[in-house]
Amino acid sequence: MTTVRTRIAPSPTGDPHVGTAYIALFNLCFARQHGGQFILRIEDTDQLRSTRESEQQIYDALRWLGIEWDEGPDVGGPHGPYRQSERGEIYKKYSDELVAKGHAFPCFCSAERLDQVRAEQMANKETPRYDGHCMHLDPAEAERRITAGESHVIRMKVPSEGVCQVQDMLRGTVEIGWDRMDMQVLMKADGLPTYFLANVVDDHLMGITHVLRGEEWLPSAPKLIKLYEYFGWEQPQLCYMPLLRNPDKSKLSKRKNPTSVTFYERMGFLPQAMLNYLGRMGWSMPDEREKFTLEEMIEHFDIQRVSLGGPIFDLEKLSWLNGQWLRELPVEQFAAEVRKWAFNPEYMMKIAPHVQQRVETFSQIAPLAGFFFSGPLQLDPALFAHKKLDATQVRQVMQLILWKLEALRQWEKERITACITQVAEHLGFKLRDVMPLMFAAITGQASSVSVLDAMEILGPDLTRFRLRNALELLGGASKKEAKEWEKLLASLG
């Protein structure tokens, strides 16, 4: 009997997302319920955005939740390497095989030509897709151009008509027309693979039997299925999980809800409660109980109990469930958890240097730095009254800073400062003009320790969360203002 093997393959390009944890949990439960193995693979082929710091954050976030893996970059295993950036020669071998078999071809089209083709297709109300310009190039000519060093990608061939039948474990048979499929790039000009080739090759070589991934990948499933067919490999069973949603049913995004696992850890949620809540996203226990452990979820797990309705990630509901867990802790464990959350040495060492020189007694620490240990702050609107900026300008400055910080990938004091400075100067203000607004939103006070240091310590999600709360207190942006301010944001670059 084949051993069930599932995997999660996150990209280390930012804070660890609750959606990643959700998919990881269901992969883990499916594997364990069938006596199988769960693998962690790192998709780091985006060399510009991938960092080892983000990779470590993924490990830390999943382990904080109690999710452990059998094989991965940090624990090793018989199917490594488990970082895609270290598997380049493997992908090249299989890319070359597809070209040799006539299932893929080198494409030399420039970005300008592709943009022109796309514009013409859209003008003619056609589905934008590659037009096959290089598909019938003479192989000798293509080889000559490659040898000469001409930039190129490798594209896969796809049928131009008919339908692909996707067998989904949750939906049954899903038919998707081939006329909706592009001739997917498999190998980029830099020699690195795209998601499609890397995932198919890795899943096959690592013996993955079941692929549970987000439903946003369902429309592109025919490309993966066709690659398995081209290689002559057995395809794993596919399961497209429903996406997490905001309470307004929109796709979960950091613009509306904190999406980083690290945020919830910093807010003081118990990992058991967080995992419990993620387990209830579209799935339920047979007896419908709301509170359960990971072990109980694994014991009773049945993938067919997953609902396709679009699970709502509701912070209020999560807080309620966390409260249930907190109140059932023995008092000694409750005290230990508080110490671990607020007064762990690593966090205290980040805060202490900024507090030590400003106090004369320990009792002065709480009024000065209590905001480091808080979630949402009780804000006084009077803190946002400004001598130079009117009420609209205050909201505009704060909204633009929030948007800039949402796009910031490396959360460092210098980069945070640069974002705020850029917005201030673009609007004709000085940095010192907007800093009181940052103090008010982030610390809830008119002055405190350096707010820029505080933002770095609090981290991106908690900082953005507080800015969002402050903006809501002040009325936020109207639809008209949001449209105008987004144009301003675009001009900032």
UniProtKB/Swiss-Prot annotation:
It catalyses: tRNA(Glu) + L-glutamate + ATP = L-glutamyl-tRNA(Glu) + AMP + diphosphate. Its cofactor is Zn(2+). It is found in: Cytoplasm. One of its GO terms (cellular component) is cytosol. A motif ('KMSKS' region) lies at residues 251-255. Its EC number is 6.1.1.17. Keywords: Aminoacyl-tRNA synthetase, ATP-binding, Cytoplasm, Ligase, Metal-binding, Nucleotide-binding, Protein biosynthesis, Zinc. PROSITE patterns: AA_TRNA_LIGASE_I. A motif ('HIGH' region) lies at residues 10-20. GO terms for biological process: glutamyl-tRNA aminoacylation. GO terms for molecular function: ATP binding; glutamate-tRNA ligase activity; tRNA binding; zinc ion binding. ATP binds at residue 254. Binds 1 zinc ion per subunit. Monomer. Belongs to the class-I aminoacyl-tRNA synthetase family. Glutamate--tRNA ligase type 1 subfamily. Catalyzes the attachment of glutamate to tRNA(Glu) in a two-step reaction: glutamate is first activated by ATP to form Glu-AMP and then transferred to the acceptor end of tRNA(Glu). PANTHER family: GLUTAMATE--TRNA LIGASE (PTHR43311), GLUTAMATE--TRNA LIGASE, MITOCHONDRIAL-RELATED (PTHR43311:SF2). This is Glutamate--tRNA ligase. It comes from Stutzerimonas stutzeri (strain A1501) (Pseudomonas stutzeri).
